[in-house]
Amino acid sequence: MEQQKAPQVTYLEVGSLVGHNGFVTSIAVSPENPDTIISSSRDKTVMVWQLTPTDATSPGKAHRSLKGHSHFVQDVVISHDGQFALSGSWDNTLRLWDITKGVSTRLFKGHTQDVMSVAFSSDNRQIISGSRDATIKVWNTLGECKFTLEGPEAHQDWVSCIRFSPNTPTIVSGSWDNKVKIWDIKSFKCNHTLTDHTGYVNTVTISPDGSLCASGGKDTFACLWELSSGKPLYKLEARNTINALAFSPNKYWLSAATDDKIIIWDLLTKQVLAEIVPEVKEQAFDSKKKKESKPKAPACLSLAWSADGSVLYAGYNDGLIRVYKSSSQ
């Protein structure tokens, strides 16, 4: 493996979004509403945040807490018109939310175990979900399940992440069976099964132009694939379990959330552009150990770039969403 060069870009923490009382499991942004982001958490809520980029004291504030799920909320996405949020929960259900009104307008029942991942099609007419019950379900917006992807050619373990292509009738799924699958959503057939991972897959994501897929998980590698053919292209090593991946919306970059840092790669050079480690305040004296306890950096679980690519939002297991900007901006 070629020698890694030193990181070339410095990202600074410009503040945090404070409001969740549990792991921040997912973050969603919308080009339609650049002053809003939405997050999900193990505190059973979906949070709508009002961003305040001109406020030097805080990057944003909690605007509305969407409540209805009875267990951890694992994933949230925003419809492409910016009007609705869709969440998946460990209570085995999905919920559709009217963002403006702050109410749940539809409840999706059908999975028999935790819902791990949800997604909208580019025309907002189809909804997909992946679950610990090892199935992928295809729904309409009325909450009716139209098809279930299961059986021998489907995943044989938890479906941890699922995403729609932005411009073709294709979905990509990742699973704890160590496989990534590429599906034709019209025929409901699996076109490709990708087997390069040697551990469970936590995350899959598709590039903004729909040409690439990236996947990551326990084996510490981000695998890049050609979406149309399923051809493996190359691997990038994170040296720690990958919890989430996100392509930059306007640069040829890929970011990875791991247990100890965020890594940003330049996909043209395959080099690390930046490594982001959160600032950790010194912890108080630990009375049980009778000595100073060494502060442990929180693990990054979720990532999202702002629609213009200038800001990186990162959700952590301490309940904070940290906001990062390049020092050159």
Curated annotation (Swiss-Prot):
WD repeats lie at residues 19-59, 68-107, 110-149, 154-193, 196-235, 237-275, 295-328. GO terms for biological process: negative regulation of translational frameshifting; rescue of stalled ribosome; sorocarp development. SUPFAM superfamilies: WD40 repeat-like (SSF50978). The keyword Ribonucleoprotein applies. GO terms for cellular component: cell leading edge; cell periphery; centrosome; cytosol; extracellular matrix; membrane; nucleus; phagocytic vesicle. GO terms for molecular function: identical protein binding; phosphatidylinositol binding; phosphatidylserine binding; protein kinase C binding; ribosome binding; translation regulator activity. It comes from the Eukaryota. Keywords: Repeat, Ribonucleoprotein, Ribosomal protein, WD repeat. Belongs to the WD repeat G protein beta family. Ribosomal protein RACK1 subfamily. This is Small ribosomal subunit protein RACK1. It comes from Dictyostelium discoideum. The gene is gpbB.
